[in-house]
Amino acid sequence: MTTARTANHLGPAVLACVLVVVAGALALSIDVPRTTYGLKSDESTYVAAALSAAYDGDLAFERKDLERFAGLYHSGPEGIFLKRGKVMRIRVRGEFPFVRIVKRDDPDRTRLYFGKAIAYSIFAAPFVRFFGLNGLLLFHVLLLGVSGSCAYAFLAAQRPPASAATIATAFMGASVLPVYGVFLMPEIFNFTIVTVAYFLWLYKEVAPQSRLARPWTTIAAAVLLGLGTYSKPLPTAVLVAPLVLLAWTRRRWMQGFMTGVVAVVVAGAFFGLNAAISGEFNYQGGDRKTFYGSFPFDAPDGSATWERRGGSVTTDASTPQEVLSSSELPARFAHNVEYFLVGRHFGFVPYFFPGVVAIAAWLLSSTARRDSWRLLTFGAIFSAAIGLLILLPWTWSGGGGPPGNRYFFTAYPALLFLVPPGISVAPGILAWIGGALFTAKLLVNPFVAAKFPYLSVEKGPARRLPVELTMANDLPVRLAQPLRGHVQYRTDPGVLLYHLDQNSWPPEPNGMWISGAGRSDIIVRAAFPIQYMQFEAESPVSTVITIALGSTPVRVTLEPRKTASFNVPASGVRGFGDYNYLLTTQSSEGFVPHLLEPANMDYRNLGAQLRFRPVTPAEASEGKALPK
């Protein structure tokens, strides 16, 4: 029987080996800076740290690190987070509080330290040492190979190989995961930590006779989650709770307590390592800056000092209190729940659809939904999501523009372990179909999707989903060039525009053109609330334009070369110190300027030119009423 069972798994095993070999060969054969289109998001910090660990055996940033980085990328480490070090001394006293931590500035002014978690860079360093930047991609391939093997082994213990392989591949291929696979950042590292940890913890629940059905596997899982907590505190720290609570529900009090202690000790050890290197336990705390354009040590005469370079950034410890005590919390939370689930850029349904299938299959299973370990796993994932929305209401997706929810991505693999036992391949096929509707274009070329994330939402089903207005300034369109995001409207400094597609253009001296080719979505970000907009519109051709500002659409027929004036009611969302509205425009007809005037070399498909003025509630109350 053992031989027959092994033969059943031979096909998936061979396929997995082929995929890992092919992906590994690709990782080692590309020109990393060119193929990945240069730097993205927070890559510069992690890459520079990995290079420093690999070639210098330290985690300090000095002039030689800048020279090495510039030699590889032919540019500086744009967006790198660095901090000045501290010399820390721990003093023990005979009176409370007994222990005192004393810090003073690092006397060596020729070195700085990295302002991000260093675990990923440390583990990736051996691969970088032997394979250069390609080693980072190879590291990701091997991590994904381990994750895929754990996912398949867990599922195959409850279902036939074909069904297990279909679901496992859907979880990895029909989600946003392939894009994060080419980001030179810790996302795949954190993903694998959670996958392996939960496999070690839960495999004994589905295969009680296996060699992994031992108490040490739970402790090993706690070690990994402790490491993950250091690397990504939220949501990983929340994922430790089910390990402790499951033991306590079974009256294994000491085992649960020790599991929690191990996770805390491991996380504390890595924060301690951070303190030993830089003098700060918090890698995001202290005297920390980010750098663009010019960098420390980039002048040979020593003039490129810390004080003359970069802009300060801090972790605001007061933010959680302010967020939780705000009177706007209920309304903001309700909007964020909607965006978290079905948001156009970061939504759970479009970018983690296999997880939706896993939850649905679990809830529909009369037996699996009563399993305490599945209930605890779902509870932890749910709690992590709620925590992100409440504590990080403006940046719960991770910021920086990557597609999908970068923070929740760490918790995503835990959803795999909700999948109930069964024999059908239908859930896996459904996961592939539903996920592919939104992520197929990401899978075709993840390098393009990673560098230009705003392109993936300009066409396809994602265009039907709501825009995350609470995080207008963190949307991928901020990365678009030529500039389409954070564009000032004409001469009004209180109004900024974010053109989410290529069916409208930034304002020109005479107004803003919308396309004749289709609907355009534009975020209007204002420093004040808007009651309605006063519009003027004109076009050289007859057309019908439809305009909405988060409320009732207004349709206006334009006659050639005649200006139409009208008002559009507004309804928006309160953002981070601003008010955000989604302006939707569409023109029924279009024209090409060159074909009307041959001397005009403008080949755009234009529909109408708009000018608008926002009207505040105070102005409206003074007698400027909306038209009936």
Which residues are covered by each model-predicted region?
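Membrane-lumen/periplasm interface segments of specific transmembrane helices
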Residues: 255-361, 378-391, 444-452
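Signature aromatic-anchored transmembrane alpha helix within multi-pass, membrane-resident enzymes
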Residues: 9-20, 215, 219-223, 240, ...
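Transmembrane-helix motifs of polytopic, lipid-linked glycan transferases
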Residues: 135-159, 196-200
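Hydrophobic, aromatic-rich transmembrane alpha-helices
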Residues: 243-247, 340, 348-374, 381, ...
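Interfacial juxtamembrane loops and adjacent helix segments
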Residues: 55-120, 127-128, 288-331
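Transmembrane-helix signature of polytopic, membrane-embedded enzymes
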Residues: 148-175, 191-192, 211-213
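Membrane-interface alpha helices of multi-pass inner-membrane proteins
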Residues: 50, 167-172, 212-232, 240-247, ...
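Perimembrane helix-loop-helix junctions
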Residues: 199-208, 237-272, 360-373
